[in-house]
Amino acid sequence: MQATLKTPLARLGQLAALALLTASLGPLATAQTATEELKLPNLGDASTSMFSAEFEHQLGRAWLRSFRSQVRTVDDPLLFDYLENLTYRLVSHSQLSDRRIELVVVDNPTINAFAVPGGVIGVHNGLLMYAQSEDELATVLAHEIAHLSQRHFSRGVEYQKSQTPINLAALLAGMVIMATAGGDAGMAAISASQALAQNNALRYSRSNEAEADRIGMQTLVDAGMDPYAAPAMFERMLQSQRFTSAERIPEFLRTHPLSENRIADTRNRARTYPKAIHPDNLEYQLMRARVINQLAATPEQAVQRFRGELAGTSRSTEAARYGLVLALTNAGRADEAALELDSIWSGDRDRIEYVIADAEIDILRDRPERAAEKLARQLKLTPGNHPLTMEYARALTRNQQAHIAEEVLTEQSKRRPNDPGLWYELAEVQGLSGNIIGLHQSRAEYFILNGYLDEAQKQLSYARRLVKNDFPTTARIDQRLADIVAMREQMESF
């Protein structure tokens, strides 16, 4: 589903670019242009509720809608489910008081993770290419969670506002472009509009970084993970920076600068904790295999990579073979994929990754009814499991059972109402089952979550005209139309 960027927040990335282009005209002109273009509210001084937890929550959700409209996100329920579970595991051991977390996974090969006020945590899938273990990945996530728990954004803006007036439009624009085009570009947008190139509003200060390092490591340890993973991951990041030209330094390192001293401090801090054995996590290695497939130029390239790993040395032979199964499936080579899967599946028949891989092979072989039966049995063991549910709906749809797939996804949407991919798939199966009113409603939810409020309003209006003598449905549609109006008003009265 395509849509134009019409809502105010969905244009933030364009405005950030505008800020860069007009910087030579003077920072005050840039700030004025951004504010007028966005029609963002005057938030008052730093003593107002703009820094309350609830304000940050609303700001973060508005930002997320904008962000989704401008980046390519990963549509992989297995990977998302894994990262979401890991994030919540860390959050449960953190100092974060408001635990309403929203995760976004960006399809980008670079090293990057970011946290946005209000509990939005973003991860580039490329980060898993660099993190060799789950603990190393968790190091980065725990660091970002620490920035949230210590409210470094609000504290930074408080300080910045005491030096010069803050323009929220420029801050949000910089946040969008910093998480997409790179840290320097985002900071340039912010700095130009604030006339404070020397005081980057969103670049974490050294004291904030040290605080996030310390608190993040404590979160890591409290979650039962390896503190030595932190210096190992930071060292790997620093090494990647040394062999990279200045303009290609990963985004995370632009906004979270590393040094030998900082790594040494992290290593010394890790030594203060008792040593323990931390075995590698197979599930993480399986997720890395999925990411390698996602980022490969072609399925055949992935096939060759995994065959090479199996012929040489691999951190996890089982994960490498699983990656080969996925690559062969993507290449349409079902028989070869099935043989490779059989060699690793026998010892763990209930592992969800393998159950779904088997179902995908069945679907590729044009046996969707068999896939649906297997997935239904597995769902009885783990009711509501998101990756299994999404694959089950896919198998049902391929088996000409769109009406049942609609029922399955409708129930799942009640559990995960903020999942854009789920609403997209639900709209597709509703179209196939002939539920046109439902199709428009689901498309509206998809557009709302992606920041396209005008498109969402159109879809709801289409649905409203089709409803005949159904008061409950009419009432639900009217309520969502009112919600869209409220979202627009919120932009002007935060």
Where do the model's predicted regions map?
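Surface-exposed patches in mature extracellular/periplasmic domains of secreted proteins
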Residues: 70-80, 93-103, 157-160, 185-188, ...
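Catalytic Zn2+-binding segment of zinc metalloproteases
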Residues: 135, 145-162, 180
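Extracytoplasmic and endomembrane cell-envelope/extracellular-matrix remodeling and assembly machinery
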Residues: 32, 43-50, 61, 73, ...
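Short pre-active-site segment immediately N-terminal to the catalytic Zn-binding motif
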Residues: 125-139, 202, 207
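Hydrophobic or amphipathic, alpha-helical segments that drive membrane association/targeting
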Residues: 2-9, 16-114, 198, 242, ...
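Membrane-active amphipathic alpha-helices enriched in small hydrophobic residues
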Residues: 165-181, 188-200
